[in-house]
């Protein structure tokens, strides 16, 4: 990370911090940073606890006239968002529960996609399943050209399909043929390939990811 960005982080004002989920909102010079750093876990996963926190953060960003845009970043060293909490999925015992879970994710990401202020997904590491669905709902996606950065919808390997809008947003982003290949195989897409196919807008070195995303 560059020295300039280190100074920016030190002078950021923390507006909100949820200790239970590890999600925080800070702002510097009109740019908000939404950081996800799930406690006691090597990766960030998505569960029913994070949705209400993201909703609060979206509302705060919408209402704060000093904020012009937002970055979505991970506090994990080599992982962005690794998808749904598998243990929570295993506790779903009925079609109605599964539908409610899916609809909740759809509503959250529809709101993210409709935000009047741009959200930039600053991706370093794995953006998998629901993590990629979140990235697709952001207006821009910037990723690091690094071996740890992979994007995929691996749910199919568990007998599932993306339930939070990924099956609609991915074809609009990369085209139907490429989207079907990802959705039906669950294959990992490396950073360079993701850029070539239009899945991300820009590739950068990890040390300047936040600088570029904040511009």
Predicted features by range, described:
Residues 2-73, 107-111:
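Conserved CoA-thioester-binding segment of acyl-CoA-metabolizing enzymes
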Residues 6-37, 136, 177, 184-215:
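Amphipathic alpha-helical segments at domain termini/boundaries
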Residues 36-40, 93, 155:
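Short, histidine-centered active-site or binding-site loop motifs used for metal coordination
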Residues 72-73, 85, 135, 194:
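Hydrophobic/aromatic residues within transmembrane alpha-helices
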Residues 74-108, 127, 157-160:
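Glycine- (often His-adjacent) and acidic-residue-rich active-site loop
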Residues 75, 106, 111-158, 162:
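Glycine-rich beta-to-alpha active-site loop
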Residues 111, 134, 169-170, 181, ...:
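Hydrophobic/aromatic ligand-binding patch that stacks against planar heteroaromatic rings
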Residues 167-177:
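Hydrophobic, secondary-structure "cap" segments at the distal end of domains
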């Amino acid at each position: 990370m560059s020295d300039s960005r280190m100074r920016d982080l030190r002078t950021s004002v923390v507006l909100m911090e949820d200790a239970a989920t590890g999600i925080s909102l800070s702002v510097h010079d009109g740019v908000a940073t939404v950081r996800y750093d799930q406690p006691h876990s090597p990766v960030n996963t998505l569960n029913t606890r994070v949705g209400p926190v993201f909703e609060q953060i979206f509302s705060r960003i919408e209402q704060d006239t000093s904020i012009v845009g937002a970055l979505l970043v991970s506090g994990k060293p080599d992982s962005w968002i690794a998808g749904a909490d598998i243990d929570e999925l295993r506790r779903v015992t009925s079609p109605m529960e599964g539908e409610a879970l899916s609809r909740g994710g759809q509503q959250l990401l529809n709101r993210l996609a409709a935000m009047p202020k741009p959200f930039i997904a600053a991706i370093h590491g794995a953006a998998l399943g629901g993590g990629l669905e979140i990235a697709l709902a952001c207006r821009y996606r910037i990723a690091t050209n690094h071996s740890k950065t992979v994007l995929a919808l691996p749910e199919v390997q568990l007998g599932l399909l993306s339930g939070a809008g990924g099956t609609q947003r991915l074809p609009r982003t990369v085209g139907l043929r490429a989207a079907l290949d990802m959705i039906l195989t669950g294959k990992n897409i490396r950073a360079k390939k993701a850029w070539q196919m239009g899945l991300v807008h820009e590739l950068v070195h990890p040390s300047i990811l936040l600088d570029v995303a904040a511009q």
